[in-house]
Amino acid sequence: MFSIKLSKILLYALCLCGALGFSQANITVSKAHPRYFEKNGATWIPISTNYLPIQNFEEAEKYFKHFAENGGNAMRIWVSTDFLEIEEQKEGKYNPEKLARIEQLLQLAEKYHIYIKFTLHHLRTIAHNTSPEASWCNSQALATKFKNVSEYISSKKGKKSYLKRLSVIAKKCANHPYFYGWELWNEIDAAVPEAEWLPFTREMLGKVKKLCPNQLVTQTLGSMHAPYMDDYYKKLAAIPNNDFLSIHRYLDEGDKWQQYPVVKGAIDSLVSNAVNIGLEFTKENPKPIVINEIGAVQPNHAGPSALYPKDTEGILLHDFIFAPFFGGSAGSGNTWHWDHYIEPNQLWYHFGRFKNAIEGIDPVAEAMQPFSFSSMNVNCYGLQGKTKTILWCRDLANNWKTELRDGIPAEIKRNFEIPLSHINNKYTHYSIYNPWTDKWERHIPIESNKALIPAFKRSIIVILEE
C-alpha cells in the first residue's frame, strides 16, 4: 500500500517539477569545473545570505531591496518557519494562505533578481507541548501523527508525509525562474543521531532529486567545530546525490563540544580551514563547497556574538564574505545574523564590495585552483587561472580580537610586496582593489618580478594578469 501511494506522490511531484522546465532557474554544477556553479551555461558565483522572514512582506521587501542593491544574488530561506510553514495545525493539512506567501516571496525574488534555495525543515522536536524557548524548532502539527522526529524520518509513513509536503511546496516553486535548490533539513544532526540522519539523507537526496531533477539538492549539518563533526561531514561528502557540500562554521570561543582552537581565532583561518577540509573530503568526487552558514556566536552558541554592536565597520562581515571564495568555495560566505548585525549596522555594502572585487573573474573559464601563502605578516589566499590570478591579502597584524575585543585600531600596512616566485613569473601587470575604500588602481606594470602593493588597511585584492 505504501509503495503504491508513494509512487503516486513521486509521479505527481515529478510532473510538477518538470512540466515547466523551460522557465526554471537552470543553475547547475559546472561539468567543466565541478567546484563551481553555472547558470544557463555561464559561470554563476552566488553572493548569498541567510534570511528568515518573520513578520510581514514590507519587512521582507526591505531586506531583499537592501541586499540586491548591494550585489546580492542568492538567499537561503527556511520554508519551515512560522511565517511560511504550510503544515501548521495538523499533519497533511496545508494552509493555502502560507502557500500564497511562498508565491509572494518568489515574486520578491524575481523583482530583485535573487535566486532562492529553500530549507525544507529545521525541526529538532515533534511534540504536543514544549517550552517557549524551544518552540521555534518544534512541530505540533506533526505531533498529530508522529511521536518524535525519529519516527518521522525513519518510518515509511513519516517519509511519505515528508515527500507529500514537498510535493505541495514544489507545485508553487519548483519551476519558478528564481528558485534553484532544496535543502533537506537544517542541521539534522541536532535532531537525531547519525544512525537515523545518515540513512534518511541518503534516501531523501535521491528521492528529492528524482522528484525535482531541475533543482540542486543538498543536506546540512551543524557547525564544523570539533573532531566528531569532521567525521559527520566526511560521511555527508561521500554521498553522490549531495549536489554540493554545505558547511556551517561559526566563531565560537566555547568548550562544551571540545571546539577546535581555529574556530576561536582569526576568521580567515577559521574559514580557509573549513573549506580545505571540504575540498579534501570531496577530492575523489569534486563538487562545489559552500559555506552555508557563517557568523559569530556567544560561547557554545548561546546567542549572537556580543561583538556585533561594536563592529560598525563590518570587520567580521568582510571576512565572512570574502574568505570562503578565495579559499576555494563556490561563492561568498552565506552569512547569518542579518537581523542582529548586518541590518542594524547597515553593512550591506560589503556584499557590493565583494561583487566589485570579483568583477571579470571567471573561475570556470580560467580553470582556477585555490592556493595560499604567507608573506610579510600577510596571509594571501588566491585563485590561479590560465591567464590571471586573483588574491585576497589579509593583514595578520589586526583581526576581530585586536580591533573589537581589545579596541586597538587597525594599522596601515605599508611596503607590502608579492614576489611572483610565489605564484608564476609569466604575469606582466596587475590591478589593485581596496574593498574598504571601493577604489581601483588598474594595469600597474610588474617590476623586478614582484607586485608592489600600495598602503592598505586590513585587506586588499590583487589581480595578476599576462
Residue ranges and their predicted role:
Residues K65, K171-K172, K207, Y233-L236, ...:
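Short, flexible, glycine/charge-rich loop motifs used to bind or transfer phosphoryl groups or to couple energy/partner
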Residues H121-L123, G295, A330:
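Flexible glycine-rich beta->alpha loop in the catalytic core of nucleotide-sugar glycosyltransferases
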Residues F146-E151, S305-Y308, H337:
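Short beta-alpha connecting loops at secondary-structure transitions
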Residues F2, S23-E69, I390, I408-E441, ...:
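Non-catalytic accessory regions flanking glycosidase/transglycosidase catalytic cores in CAZymes
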